[in-house]
Amino acid sequence: MNLENVTYKDTTPFVPPITGGKVIKVYDGDTLTLATTLPFEGSPMYRFSVRTKGIDCPEMKTKNANEKHCAKLARDMIKSKCLNKIVELRNVELEKYGRILADIYVDGVDVKTFLLDANLAVAYDGGTKVTPEDWLVYYNLKNA
């Protein structure tokens, strides 16, 4: 196959061959940015936005005050656990919108467990989202 004849259906999405890196930014509870190199000699230091596989957190960009409050709690929890730390990525793939999706481990612990245990995330498999009617009520079930 040459480039002149290639079509979209002849290609596969590129999944960066990354297995970990240093967390340099936390956007929200389930999205962070890593600094890492690719596995070839002389690779520059790249940054990748990575979404945590298997969960959905409250959204930062919402008009709902309770959801935004819980989104900030989730973000701050992940910042405290992960920011400026080296993390390991497992099961790296692309999700339906082309973003990197992975299981993210810090100090041997899957970071999604912190959020699920605190009711700051719900399980999510990429299909239809089922989220709490009120994130703050859901959070307070375990944290009141």
Predicted regions span which residues?
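Small beta-barrel nucleic-acid-binding modules, primarily SNase/OB-fold domains
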Residues: 1-144
